[in-house]
Amino acid sequence: MLALKISVYTIVFFFVGIFLFGFLASDPTRTPNRKDLESPQD
């Protein structure tokens, strides 16, 4: 039962993390006021 709970929490946090990361990563692209996005600094 503990393994099931751990696996469920892992999957939930995994998808929540991906959703939050994708939302925060795509958020500046929706704001046309950000001019620094045109010159990516890797």
From Swiss-Prot:
Keywords: Membrane, Photosynthesis, Photosystem II, Reaction center, Thylakoid, Transmembrane, Transmembrane helix. Pfam families: PsbI. It is a single-pass membrane protein. GO terms for cellular component: photosystem II reaction center; plasma membrane-derived thylakoid membrane. It is found in: Cellular thylakoid membrane. NCBIfam families: PRK02655.1. One of the components of the core complex of photosystem II (PSII), required for its stability and/or assembly. PSII is a light-driven water:plastoquinone oxidoreductase that uses light energy to abstract electrons from H(2)O, generating O(2) and a proton gradient subsequently used for ATP formation. It consists of a core antenna complex that captures photons, and an electron transfer chain that converts photonic excitation into a charge separation. PSII is composed of 1 copy each of membrane proteins PsbA, PsbB, PsbC, PsbD, PsbE, PsbF, PsbH, PsbI, PsbJ, PsbK, PsbL, PsbM, PsbT, PsbX, PsbY, Psb30/Ycf12, peripheral proteins PsbO, CyanoQ (PsbQ), PsbU, PsbV and a large number of cofactors. It forms dimeric complexes. This is Photosystem II reaction center protein I. It comes from Prochlorococcus marinus (strain MIT 9301).
